[in-house]
Amino acid sequence: MGPVMLDVASYELDAEEREILKHPLVGGLILFSRNFHDAEQLRELVRQIRAASHERLVVAVDQEGGRVQRFRDGFTRLPAAQSFAAINDAATAAQLAQEAGWLMAAEMMAMDIDISFAPVLDIGHVSAAIGERSFHSDPQQARIMAECFIRGMHSAGMKTTGKHFPGHGAVTADSHKETPHDNRPLAEIRTHDMVIFRELIQRKLLDAIMPAHVIYTEADARPASGSAYWLQEILRQELGFEGIIFSDDLSMEGAAIMGSYAERGQASLDAGCDMILVCNNRQGAVSVLDNLSPIKADQLTRLYHSGQFDRQTLMASSRWQQANKALTALSERWDAHKQTLGQ
């Protein structure tokens, strides 16, 4: 299995995509909204992906909830992470967060999708890229809700990906459009943003981590996603993380400072990433495959899902029906709340 995760253009594979998926450097594929028409079509697309590749790829999606939910029609409307903090009763909030993690994972695994890149562990809501994707502005409250969501995912059989290390929540710039700089003292990042990663790693709850395309100016001139300081010295050595490290999408503007697509990919792998994402630019992805040093990433097989869910059986279950009703209601209340704030 190779270290590159790619995307595909539409509802089904074309001939070029079938050939690309056979490349020895390809180890994963991420799906987007453009790949989804309905549940039956999605399941068939995943089947095509499995059939086209020599090895079982890690199939992924961003199905966080709120504004980042790639598959909507026919799937539960998942609430934004921040909405759980608006529930007055802490026990109810914790239970619902756990059910959200379970339900999201179960619905994805019924499509034979291995992972959703979740949860978001960024602290605070000022970032344009993060906002309501963050559970809370208080690190301990965020950790409590994230841990519940994670336990739900794990109970269903899906591995977790904490993002965006060491924390994207304090920068207003959107790394999809530019390279954000976080100029805060390193001590503040460590005690405010990084503590949630530290605690969840200590509890063995994170299977993978995705670093941020953010430059933390007191630490390194490179974004964390291409920084050996953050990925090896801090994440591996200091925090003792033994799971998978993903780059964020290298087509994002936040990664452009690292050079061409091939240079971005090599820099991220050299810095300590196990798998790199190259999406939304076919030419860039092919350039990475043509120029990357040969490398195996067999540790990625740890991310295969272990849940066995039939979609019809799942949706007929009382647990799914109760969770679906409660989570849909929370989503609607949260949207109404945002409207009163003019958001």
Curated annotation (Swiss-Prot):
Principal subcellular localisation of the protein: cytoplasm
Biological function: Plays a role in peptidoglycan recycling by cleaving the terminal beta-1,4-linked N-acetylglucosamine (GlcNAc) from peptide-linked peptidoglycan fragments, giving rise to free GlcNAc, anhydro-N-acetylmuramic acid and anhydro-N-acetylmuramic acid-linked peptides.
Site (Important for catalytic activity): D174
Binding residue positions for substrate: D62, R70, R133, K163, H164
Compartment(s): Cytoplasm
Classification of source organism: Bacteria, Pseudomonadati, Pseudomonadota, Gammaproteobacteria, Enterobacterales
UniProt-listed Pfam families: Glyco_hydro_3 (PF00933)
UniProt keyword Cell division, yes or no: yes
Record: active site: H176 (proton donor/acceptor), D248 (nucleophile)
Domain of life, per lineage: Bacteria
Catalysed reactions, semicolon-separated: Hydrolysis of terminal non-reducing N-acetyl-D-hexosamine residues in N-acetyl-beta-D-hexosaminides
Organism for this UniProt entry: Yersinia pseudotuberculosis serotype O:1b (strain IP 31758)
Alphabetical keyword list: Cell cycle, Cell division, Cell shape, Cell wall biogenesis/degradation, Cytoplasm, Glycosidase, Hydrolase, Peptidoglycan synthesis
Protein name: Beta-hexosaminidase
E.C. no: 3.2.1.52
